[in-house]
């Protein structure tokens, strides 16, 4: 194997490994972080991760392509083709899911804007009811002088805080799995050629 071919394969495998790691990091961040934080303070970080992953995926696919088509016919192994397709396939999965979810979200938001506020179903009153089984002096503090209990404000449940388009965690995990499988088979393929010995 020529030195140039070994270098291009090494760059391709390293790039697909970094690409898989970035997708895994993005999956972990989006699955463990609330939506408000993702759409607020983490947006620049996620944008940077997306741009880096796009660049690494394109870089890896290019070097896998150069390694496959630049090799003599006896060294054109299928793992180079599979590695070349891992990044575009995972990007395709994310692109289709994003397009589907954005169309679905815009359709739901259009339908909800057609109904006036009065015709929307009322929220359940059960989530607003609180029974305080604490001390009696707490109840006397909240009771005004006319004998009626004071109205208390209840914080909204966590589900009410999640607004905006849903995060595509399942699709991101599927794209990450595709990239990881591409990376693992590329490492096994390069190792099988004896490049690491």
From Swiss-Prot:
**Region entry Disordered: which residue ranges?**
135-154
Membrane topology, as annotated, equals: Multi-pass membrane protein
Q: Which GO terms describe its cellular component?
A: mitochondrial outer membrane
Look up the domain of life of the source.
Answer: Eukaryota
Q: What does the entry give for GO biological process? A: autophagy of mitochondrion; macroautophagy
Quick one: where is this thing mainly located? Answer: mitochondrion
Q: Where are the transmembrane segments?
A: 10-30, 52-72, 78-98, 172-192
Which InterPro entries does this one have? ATG33
Localization terms from the record: Mitochondrion membrane
Query: PTM Phosphoserine: at which residues?
Result: 127, 129
Biased composition annotated in UniProt, kind: Basic and acidic residues: 135-148
Which keywords has UniProt assigned to this entry? Autophagy, Membrane, Mitochondrion, Phosphoprotein, Transmembrane, Transmembrane helix
**Family per record:** Belongs to the ATG33 family.
**Protein task:** Involved in the selective degradation of mitochondria via autophagy during starvation and at post-log phase.
> What is the protein named?
Autophagy-related protein 33
Write the lineage as a comma-separated list. Eukaryota, Fungi, Dikarya, Ascomycota, Saccharomycotina
């Amino acid at each position: 194997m020529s030195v140039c071919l070994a270098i291009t394969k090494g760059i391709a495998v390293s790039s697909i490994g970094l690409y898989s790691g970035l997708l895994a990091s993005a999956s972990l961040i989006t699955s463990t972080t609330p939506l408000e934080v993702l759409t607020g303070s983490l947006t620049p970080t996620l944008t940077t991760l997306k741009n880096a992953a796009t660049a690494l995926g394109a870089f890896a696919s290019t070097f896998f392509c150069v390694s496959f088509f630049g090799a003599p016919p006896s060294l054109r192994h299928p793992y180079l083709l599979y590695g070349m397709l891992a990044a575009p396939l995972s990007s395709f999965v994310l692109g289709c899911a994003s397009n589907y979810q954005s169309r679905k979200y815009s359709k739901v938001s259009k339908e909800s804007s057609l109904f006036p506020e009065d015709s929307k179903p009322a929220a359940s009153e059960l989530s607003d009811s609180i029974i305080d089984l604490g001390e009696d002096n707490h109840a006397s503090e909240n009771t005004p002088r006319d004998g009626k209990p004071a109205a208390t404000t209840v914080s909204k449940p966590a589900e009410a805080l999640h607004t905006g388009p849903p995060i595509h965690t399942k699709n991101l995990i599927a794209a990450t799995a595709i990239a990881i499988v591409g990376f693992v088979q590329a490492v096994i393929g390069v190792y099988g050629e004896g490049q690491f010995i």
